[in-house]
């Protein structure tokens, strides 16, 4: 009864007011799966292609009617009659039919929406929650954990209209005993941060990922105000709550230098910027740094890994773009020690699971992540639990596109109880 009988694609709106692709997969037994593709702002150059129409008279060129047409046309034709439970087979048909290295014919947004909708339909057909089905697809049935959230409470870079160069300043409630408690701790710090910023006469408007986006005197000041908020909330920094950053350094890499415009155009070499970050880790309990250099600066990353890699988690996002070919090369060259996992960078569930497995097999951690352009689709919560990835990045404590994922984690934890432990600090590379 898990035979696909109908596939529907449609254009919906994401959290930035831009169109994205939503797909429905209908099965013979009456079960339906529905999923939407997210969209990034700071994107790696080697990501799978997000197909946009380019018609400036409609959605400023960002329409996705071509990708939707691919779902309703060739993809639907190829998949009708196939077994939804064969996720790898379904994804392979779409990838082969597209025939390009970066999914540029149909768009990764089209293929991913169908891939995830198919997984949801198959889970429904099997009478199980999505996380349980994902664990089976992953070859790890019944093995779950609740992820430590990385909560992006100060937004900068491409995610905010402010003068802060580093894109994300995050808290990790590592001292919590459950994900529900971790979310409460994050919420309390978030609200205390608003009070701290207001007391300093700073803006408390939020950025794309729901964190505050004030103008600050320096990148270090973001860490200082967060430290103040953690203390005001009654928590101990470094014990109850640790810090993480996403530099998204490719966004301020210009002519071979790392230029911090918000700090008077200070320019750094790869080595100098590594030591700039190292100093911050000495001043604050920063346990994870993502994209600490430009995605193409592999020599710099090798140096950064040598300097910081045995002390903290170094996460590759633009660096690896959830791509097993690139990750394999990084593992062989000893670049970073963790990978950020974003479905739409690679464009299918099967390839996403392959990247998580490769990372884990090599002793790298995997951090499951949203994109800055999101929808109410909470699939990443199920992915994090179903692969026992251990960490999740899904924004701050505001905007329902972010909070939807936290609420799903609360529901999953309630359902699984002790079968899905919250392991806190030991999930983070170098912190066990």
Curated annotation (Swiss-Prot):
SUPFAM superfamilies in the cross-refs: Enolase C-terminal domain-like, Enolase N-terminal domain-like
GO cellular component, one term: cell surface
Record-listed (2R)-2-phosphoglycerate binding positions: 167, 342, 371-372, 393
Keywords: Cytoplasm, Glycolysis, Lyase, Magnesium, Metal-binding, Secreted
Reaction it catalyzes: (2R)-2-phosphoglycerate = phosphoenolpyruvate + H2O
Enzyme class, first EC level, given as a word: lyase
Cofactor binding annotation: Binds a second Mg(2+) ion via substrate during catalysis.
E.C. number(s) listed in UniProt: 4.2.1.11
UniProt binding sites for Mg(2+): 246, 290, 317
Subcellular location: Cytoplasm; Secreted; Cell surface
Pfam families named among the record's database cross-references: Enolase_C, Enolase_N
Chief subcellular location: cytoplasm
Cofactor: Mg(2+)
Biological-process GO terms, alphabetical: glycolytic process
Active site: 209, 342
A GO molecular function held by the record: magnesium ion binding
Keyword hit for Magnesium: yes
InterPro entries for the chain: Enolase (IPR000941), Enolase-like_C_sf (IPR036849), Enolase-like_N (IPR029017), Enolase_C (IPR020810), Enolase_CS (IPR020809), Enolase_N (IPR020811)
Pathway stated in the Swiss-Prot or TrEMBL entry: Carbohydrate degradation; glycolysis; pyruvate from D-glyceraldehyde 3-phosphate: step 4/5
KW Cytoplasm (keyword) present: yes
Function field: Catalyzes the reversible conversion of 2-phosphoglycerate (2-PG) into phosphoenolpyruvate (PEP). It is essential for the degradation of carbohydrates via glycolysis.
Similarity comment: family membership: Belongs to the enolase family.
Oligomeric and partner information: Component of the RNA degradosome, a multiprotein complex involved in RNA processing and mRNA degradation.
UniProt protein name: Enolase
